[in-house]
Amino acid sequence: MSRRHSAEKRQIIPDAKYGDVVLTKFMNSVMYEGKKSVAESIVYGAFDIIESRARVNPIEVFRAALDNVAPAIEVRSRRVGGATYQVPVEVRHERRQALAIRWLIQAARSRNDRTMVERLSAELLDAANNRGAAVKKREDTHRMAEANRAFSHYRW
């Protein structure tokens, strides 16, 4: 890690259809091997399915899913005198968003539907309704933090 400068944050351009910066970050995470057009077609296809099935604005479903998946607290390992403790710490906003995006995509990829469009739309709808693998991951993280609450005084 460099000691001179912290890397400057790049300006992310909002997506063309909905004008949302977070959605662009989501698409960039879905993207493989720089194929942004494929990632866009996957995300927009999933949004079309959400719109036709649930009859609601897909961007609202997306935001609700992100809010329901984003963790408020997580555990980090801290070594104290030969023992390693799992110390619960609060999660910064940027990391909350990044974790929520990562967990949603991982959960969608591990589903058993035929195409990624179907898997992603199903996972987003589930997460918006507080169900699904991504929400379970957040609950497991919170449960782990709650179980290790006794070590919270080791926070840094």
Curated annotation (Swiss-Prot):
Keyword Ribosomal protein on entry: yes
UniProt entry keywords in alphabetical sequence: Ribonucleoprotein, Ribosomal protein, RNA-binding, rRNA-binding, tRNA-binding
SUPFAM superfamilies xrefs: Ribosomal protein S7 (SSF47973)
Molecular function via GO: rRNA binding; structural constituent of ribosome; tRNA binding
Gene Ontology biological-process annotations: translation
InterPro entries named among the record's database cross-references: Ribosomal_uS7, Ribosomal_uS7_bac/org-type, Ribosomal_uS7_CS, Ribosomal_uS7_dom, Ribosomal_uS7_dom_sf
A GO-annotated cellular component: small ribosomal subunit
Binding partners and assembly: Part of the 30S ribosomal subunit. Contacts proteins S9 and S11.
Family of this protein: Belongs to the universal ribosomal protein uS7 family.
Function: One of the primary rRNA binding proteins, it binds directly to 16S rRNA where it nucleates assembly of the head domain of the 30S subunit. Is located at the subunit interface close to the decoding center, probably blocks exit of the E-site tRNA.
Name by which UniProt lists this protein: Small ribosomal subunit protein uS7
Gene: rpsG
